[in-house]
Swiss-Prot record:
The gene is Lamp5. It is a single-pass type I membrane protein. Residues 257-280 are cytoplasmic. Pfam families: Lamp2-like_luminal. It comes from Rattus norvegicus (Rat). It is found in: Cytoplasmic vesicle membrane; Cell membrane; Cell projection, Dendrite; Cytoplasmic vesicle, Secretory vesicle, Synaptic vesicle membrane. This is Lysosome-associated membrane glycoprotein 5. PANTHER family: LYSOSOME-ASSOCIATED MEMBRANE GLYCOPROTEIN (PTHR11506), LYSOSOME-ASSOCIATED MEMBRANE GLYCOPROTEIN 5 (PTHR11506:SF35). Residues 1-29 form the signal peptide. Belongs to the LAMP family.
Length: 280
């Protein structure tokens, strides 16, 4: 074998070796994942933590439910009718994840891998009037479901594995270095590989941070969703108005008391002129 052939062979071996170590590194990173859902006081909420090199790099708390339409035969066995399966993310799910500087991913599997949820987060920088600003967002959701699973699907036609994907998704947009929090329900539509079917993903009680976690197992400052901020304002506004009204009443009473006291101390001038002779 000539020198050129040996060099090519050596280069191929080096590439294979690098690919092997890269795959091993990813595998090790994915193994550093914890399901802490048992710590949640909300039985519907799951808690997932991804750690790399002994440090938390992704934290996610949320409750998830999927509304999945599927076809069944009508009673005449000629027509098809559409039913809906409601699939909730359950505790004890298997979880994998990976963290990157600009891209992080969370994968969750449950019911013997009949269901798989994949969430992809990206961090981006944008030029604004204030300068360069970085944000992160949920850029892709994929839900794989098996309609032959009998717990949620009853006699589904063409039962089997289907994949539902988001389309041009930009959700949970949050300034970099902050966590996203939203107690209100949020819906994301997913186009299914099952023809003409749209899966609806419902998220609630969300608290997520896929980048820039400073303290282990601790979320950074929260960026609240607009719905939560509006609800918080609606809750505090009556209290603020009540305090203002109470303050106005107190001020009015004080002014009345001062005025009444000043009036009482003034010399009373008799209206009847005949009384002047008794004065002095």
């Amino acid at each position: 074998m000539d020198l050129r052939g040996r060099a090519l062979l050596g280069g191929d071996r080096l590439r294979i070796l690098l690919m092997f170590f890269h795959a091993m590194a990813q595998t090790v990173a994915e193994q550093e994942v914890e399901n802490l859902s048992g710590l949640s006081t909300n039985p519907e909420k799951d808690i997932f933590v991804v750690r790399e090199n002994g440090t938390t790099c992704l934290m996610a708390e949320f409750a998830a439910k999927f509304i999945v339409p599927y076809d069944v035969w009508a009673s005449n066995y000629v027509d098809l009718i559409t039913e809906q399966a409601e699939i909730s993310l359950t505790r004890g799910a298997e979880v994998k994840g990976r963290c990157g500087h600009n891209e992080s991913e969370l994968q969750v599997f449950w019911v013997d891998r009949a269901y798989t949820l994949k969430m992809l987060f990206v961090k981006e920088s944008h030029n604004t009037s204030k300068g360069l600003e970085a944000t992160w967002k949920l850029s892709k959701v994929q839900f794989v479901y098996d309609s032959s699973e009998k717990t949620h699907f009853k006699d589904a036609v063409s039962a089997g594995k289907h994949t539902a994907n988001s389309h041009h998704l930009s959700a949970l947009v949050t300034p970099a270095g902050m966590s996203y929090e939203c107690q209100a329900q949020q819906t994301i539509s997913l186009a299914s590989s099952d023809p003409q079917k749209t899966v609806t993903m419902i998220l609630s009680a969300v608290h997520i941070q896929p980048f820039d976690i400073i303290s282990d197992f601790v979320f950074s400052e929260e960026h609240k969703c607009p719905v939560d901020e509006r609800e918080q304002l609606e809750e505090t506004l009556p209290l603020i108005l009540g305090l203002i009204l109470g303050l106005v009443i107190v001020i009015t009473l004080v002014i009345y008391h001062i005025h009444h006291k000043m009036t009482a101390n003034q010399v009373q001038i008799p209206r009847d002129r005949s009384q002047y002779k008794h004065m002095g």
